[in-house]
Design a protein with these regions (language model features):
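Conserved small/polar residues in nucleotide/adenosyl-binding loops
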Residues: 135-137
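Glycine-rich phosphate-binding loop signature in dinucleotide/nucleotide-binding domains
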Residues: 108-113
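Residue-level preference for the first positions of well-ordered beta-strands
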Residues: 33, 114-115
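Metal-dependent catalytic neighborhoods of phosphoester/phosphodiester hydrolases
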Residues: 129-130
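Helix-loop module immediately N-terminal to the HCX5R catalytic loop
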Residues: 95-106
Length: 137
């Protein structure tokens, strides 16, 4: 677990859209990192739409390769991760959504994984930092 699907076994355009074709799992334990989407744009100051960011990043990441030819390193030989899906935010409700973001990030941290967070608007940094501060301060 924790490594992407082999594109020789399953074409890149097939399957559930996850970041870099990682396994999808809400259980992050036993992994080094967990990708977490935060499709939130309630606090955007001009034009909404960044809520579609996590889906667009996942879609584009399906063609990424884990091997870097210049450095001769495959990231998944050194770490493993999962795509933990998106936080179920509540459009239009800032405080309640922040509580859910905070809880989701805390859940990843409690499982011993590093959260890799894709957003959303700039405001999602606050609940993320609140969750991180509980273990790093």
């Amino acid at each position: 677990m924790g490594v992407p699907v082999n594109s020789l076994a399953s074409p890149r355009f097939c399957g559930v859209r996850t970041f870099q074709r990682l396994p999808h799992s809400a259980d992050c334990s036993g992994n080094d990192f967990a990708v977490l989407g935060v499709p939130f744009d309630t606090a955007t100051s001009y034009r909404p739409g960044c809520r579609f960011g996590p889906a667009a990043i996942r879609d584009a990441s399906s063609i990424l390769k884990s091997y870097h030819s210049v450095l001769d390193v495959d990231i998944f030989e050194h770490c493993q991760g999962v795509d933990a899906g998106d936080v179920d935010i509540i459009p239009g409700y800032l405080d309640e959504s922040f509580e859910r973001i905070d809880a989701a990030v805390a859940g990843v941290l409690d499982a011993g994984a590093v959260p890799v967070i894709m957003g959303g608007d700039h405001s999602i940094t606050l609940p993320e930092l609140r969750a991180l501060s509980l273990i790093h301060i």
